[in-house]
């Protein structure tokens, strides 16, 4: 939950902090240079009126370039920040949906340890009646393990017939009559 919040805060900080390099490059490439550098050094106007007009034109050029960063910031918001916010919202919705379905699935599939109901359902006629389960009705761990052992032994006997392994009776007979195999 912290990671999406951190990503959102990071995106907002990036959007709100103006980038200084872009403004510098715009001023450098905009062609707004002082009038003095465009004129040859041979001609200098010593009058105060000329200096005032140069400063006014320079201020007007600088003020006209100040509107460009605001437009660039608006373009940045439209092109980067809005899709980024939509992507974060999409990821958050996927995370919430995944957790919702995960919780729903765990509620539907109860675990085998301790979650069994204390009531057992029996059908009596057309009605389902819930009857409490008593200790005598539930098999003990030893009974369950013995049943599993019997199943395993039966499967071993069936497999032994197919693989031509000696059965238990054949092994016992061979153990009782060792003199037959020695002579």
From Swiss-Prot:
Residues 23-75 are extracellular. The chain crosses the membrane at residues 76-96. The gene is TMEM154. This is Transmembrane protein 154. Residues 97-183 are cytoplasmic. Residues 163-183 are annotated as: Disordered. GO terms for cellular component: membrane. It is found in: Membrane.
């Amino acid at each position: 939950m912290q990671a999406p919040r951190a990503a959102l805060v990071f995106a907002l900080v990036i959007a709100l902090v103006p980038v200084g390099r872009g403004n510098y490059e715009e001023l450098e490439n905009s062609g707004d240079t002082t009038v003095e550098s465009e004129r040859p050094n041979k001609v200098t106007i010593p009058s105060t009126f000329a200096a005032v007009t140069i400063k006014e034109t320079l201020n007007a050029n600088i003020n006209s370039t100040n509107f460009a960063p605001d437009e660039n910031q608006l373009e940045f918001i439209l092109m980067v920040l809005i899709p980024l916010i939509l992507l974060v919202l999409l990821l958050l919705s996927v995370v919430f949906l995944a957790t919702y379905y995960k919780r729903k699935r765990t509620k539907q599939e109860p675990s085998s340890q301790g979650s069994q109901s204390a009531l057992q359902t029996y059908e009596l006629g057309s009605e389902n009646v819930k009857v409490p389960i008593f200790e005598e009705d539930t098999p003990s761990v030893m009974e369950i393990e013995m049943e599993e052992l019997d199943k395993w032994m039966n499967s071993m006997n069936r497999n032994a017939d197919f693989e031509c392994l000696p059965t238990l009776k054949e092994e016992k007979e061979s153990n009782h009559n060792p003199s037959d195999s020695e002579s």
